[in-house]
Amino acid sequence: MKTGLRLALSSILCVAAHAHAVEILPDENYHDMQVYRPTGDVKEVVYLLADHGTQEAAITRLGERLARESTLVVRIDSAKLLADLQNLKANCVDLGSDFEGQSHYLQARYQLPTYHPPYFVGIGNGAALTYALLAQAPTSTFAGVLSLDFCPEVQLRTPLCRGDDLRTAKHAATGTTELLPLTRSHTRWVVQPDESGLRCDARATRSFVSRLPASNLITVRSARTTATDPAGPAAFEAIGQLLSHPVPGSKPATSSLADLPLIEVLPQGVGTDTFAVLLSGDGGWTGLDKDVAAALAARGVAVVGWDSLRYFWKARTPDELASDANRLIAHYSQQWQKPHVMLLGYSQGANVLPFLVNRLSGDARGKVSLVAMTGLGLQADFEFHFANWVGASAKSLAILPETARLGSPKAICIYGREDPESSCMQLDPKRVQAIALPGGHHFNGDYGKVAETILQAAALRR
């Protein structure tokens, strides 16, 4: 069960604060969230989880300084959040999922021209919470996480959901929830351990950090800790480390496709005569999308990832989608010298795929060897709305009439046997082959099996 931490943006109260306006967003879960908005374009979105009342003036300076650097900053009282979670009536707390949804809602509310996977900065109590949400969310859901004065424990009665890779243990002596190290490389994490030993055993913290995968970890040390001065040199050294790297999954595109949010995943070993275009789910290029692409690349298939969250951040039409696909297919067919392409889609990406295929140019459609729809629903949306996470919007288009028009090329529909919203079994078997796999909409996390199913259907040539 999710914690249901959603924005209640019924009103916005603005108060003047030095060089930037601080907007107070009333919320039933977060109390009053403070939003520092830059005067110009937003380059990054940062959630700042810190206790109110602790170095308040310094935390305010931190928010203002980040806003001057074109960062939209959302300040949340981590102490109040933690207190509310103590009384939560739920099986477990899923901060990763909740903050992902909240970020979508917030950025849509402010009508940012493109979606920015958020960064998180946690101080004190917020440091442990930011580590937890990083581990719970699929890789690249967030741009990066910074935990300042980090201790690997949190006072919480309700268990934390495992999510993607969060492991915990209950401390027998104190009753606190002990956070355990990640088991594999994950979203970028910058950490400044609590070396003072005032909040936790500094040796335990150092041991925790030493057991983490080094590929996504940077340890920042300073004689002056962030607990002493949250807006001082130590904090900004760490924040600089966090923001100095590109957002995971982002890749400079060629000039002809610079307007499309694409990610190239190059093949390993002997390549095939076919490349794949994979339209992601509405959460963006993460989770299943990344893992399936990696599995295909390991088998010699070059993949062009197409980030649905960023692409549909503004309203699109089926014709516009197909026109962009024509450009993409023509470009990569020539650049990679591959005559065939597989068109793949997951969740929202699968929902729009029949509309795309039916509107392709004759030349592009002639190159398509396989259409694979994974986690197909009943309605397709061509613009992101936060309400889409709950159900289809009023502008949704019915999918079944489009799938009824599919003929050549070969089409398959992959679904989880436990997914109640799948429409695969409603499709005409003469046009689309339905293939069932164990699990629900996320296939029990066995994304390698999804990739293998696609490869078996494709019968690729090398």
Descriptions of predicted regions:
Residues 20-41, 228-271:
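N-terminal cap/lid segment of alpha/beta-hydrolase-fold proteins
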Residues 37, 152-211, 381-435, 439:
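The feature captures the conserved acid-bearing segment of alpha/beta-hydrolase catalytic domains
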Residues 38-70, 77, 266-301, 305-308:
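Short, surface-exposed "cap/lid" segments of acyl-processing enzymes
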Residues 72, 77-82, 151, 302, ...:
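Short beta-to-alpha linker loops that shape the active-site pocket of alpha/beta-hydrolase fold enzymes
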Residues 74, 210-229, 302-305, 429-444:
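Catalytic histidine neighborhood in serine/cysteine hydrolases
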Residues 79-94, 282-284, 307-320:
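Cap/lid segment of the alpha/beta-hydrolase catalytic domain
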Residues 89-112, 315-336, 351-355:
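Alpha/beta-hydrolase active-site loop
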Residues 109-174, 331, 340-394, 402:
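Primarily recognizes the serine-hydrolase "nucleophile elbow" in alpha/beta-hydrolase
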